[in-house]
Amino acid sequence: MTQQIQVDLGERSYPIYIGQSLMSDSETLSRYLLKKRILIVTNETVAPLYLKQIQDTMASFGEVSSVILPDGEQFKDLTHLDSIFTALLQRNYGRDSVLVALGGGVIGDMTGFAAACYQRGVDFIQIPTTLLSQVDSSVGGKTAVNHPLGKNMIGAFYQPQIVIIDTECLQTLPAREFAAGMAEVIKYGIMWDADFFQWLENNVQALKSLDTQALVYAISRCCEIKADVVSQDETEQGVRALLNLGHTFGHAIEAEMGYGNWLHGEAVAAGTVLAAQTAKSMGLIDESIVRRIVQLFHAFDLPVTAPESMDFDSFIKHMRRDKKVLGGQIRLVLPTAIGRADVFSQVSESTLEQVICCA
């Protein structure tokens, strides 16, 4: 059964559909593609699996072209973004274009940013194929590319027309990528929904075995939370910042270790543990909460410690460039309970050094 969730943003509201075989559902896509010139953006891993299926589904609506990019976070940059613009310009695509992001978070972020920029804005559709992109990056309109000095530093808020989440894609997802997606799933439980966190603790094996009912529930709950948060705070002026739990530490790990060497979800898992340990050191939570967080990440085969090669200086140089920094102060999202988090701007660097060095 297909689930539908609405992201309520007034005239820019859009639906999220979650279910099986949705990539073959031309009826759902028809209103967004009729009389449009379609460019599918995908990568070398996803294209052999799903590109022809999507092309066949969309062929009756209009001209369909594709651009296939290399796979990996290290290619989420201005050079490869330009490949999308070149494909559009070479084919003389105009404002009647629609870009379709067929892939994980990298493809979604780059396609959305290209859509935001091309001729000052054309429509785009998200068809996320990884767990991480299904539960997080495809929803909410954050689009960006990386810079050598920082992750997601060049981008825009730009909402899709629709998000199509076909859970059958997860059957071809490598185990490491699935685990990385679970890091974001767990994050929602920590920062927003204690009951969901407990449900995850009780359903580890069902999720790891790709049980359809468990997957649909987990993805739907994450999308419900994300839609609720984005509807309240689209441009991250308030409550949306809570979705960055673990990301300040995590982005530092990704940047320092080289994009693609640590998957985003792996870095978020280790970063969230560091955030929990920081919260404990400040007296916000006790050791039992840290232990539950560590145990759940560990159950999904995720890292719970930072790279051994990273010391305090390695972290802090990246954390000072974080997008949440205001007035020169590092702002951290820290858990205050299972199911609750808050933003803290008075975290001393001495506290951070103690946590990082003792982790």
Curated annotation (Swiss-Prot):
From its record, what is one biological process in GO terms? aromatic amino acid family biosynthetic process
Keyword NADP annotated: no
Which reaction equation describes what this protein catalyses? 7-phospho-2-dehydro-3-deoxy-D-arabino-heptonate = 3-dehydroquinate + phosphate
Q: Where in the cell is it found?
A: Cytoplasm
Q: Which Enzyme Commission number(s) are listed?
A: 4.2.3.4
Cofactor(s) recorded for this entry are: Co(2+); Zn(2+); NAD(+)
Q: How is the cofactor bound?
A: Binds 1 divalent metal cation per subunit. Can use either Co(2+) or Zn(2+).
- Gene3D superfamilies given in the database record: 3.40.50.1970, Dehydroquinate synthase-like - alpha domain
Origin, by domain of life?
Answer: Bacteria
Quote the record's binding site residues for Zn(2+).
184, 247, 264
Q: In which broad location class does this protein mainly occur, judging by the first location in its UniProt entry?
A: cytoplasm
Q: In which pathway does it act?
A: Metabolic intermediate biosynthesis; chorismate biosynthesis; chorismate from D-erythrose 4-phosphate and phosphoenolpyruvate: step 2/7
MF-aspect GO terms: 3-dehydroquinate synthase activity; metal ion binding; nucleotide binding
Q: Which InterPro entries match?
A: Dehydroquinate_synthase (IPR050071), DHQ_synth_AroB (IPR016037), DHQ_synth_fam (IPR030963), DHQS/DOIS_N (IPR030960), DHQS_C (IPR056179)
Q: Does the keyword GTP-binding apply?
A: no
Cite the binding residues for NAD(+).
71-76, 105-109, 129-130, 142, 151, 169-172
Enzyme class (EC, first level)? lyase
Annotated Gene Ontology cellular components are: cytoplasm
UniProtKB keywords:
Amino-acid biosynthesis, Aromatic amino acid biosynthesis, Cobalt, Cytoplasm, Lyase, Metal-binding, NAD, Nucleotide-binding, Zinc
Q: What does this protein do?
A: Catalyzes the conversion of 3-deoxy-D-arabino-heptulosonate 7-phosphate (DAHP) to dehydroquinate (DHQ).
Family in the record: Belongs to the sugar phosphate cyclases superfamily. Dehydroquinate synthase family.
Please name the PANTHER family in this protein's record: 3-DEHYDROQUINATE SYNTHASE (PTHR43622), 3-DEHYDROQUINATE SYNTHASE, CHLOROPLASTIC (PTHR43622:SF7)
Q: What is this protein called?
A: 3-dehydroquinate synthase
- Organism, scientific name: Shewanella sp. (strain MR-7)
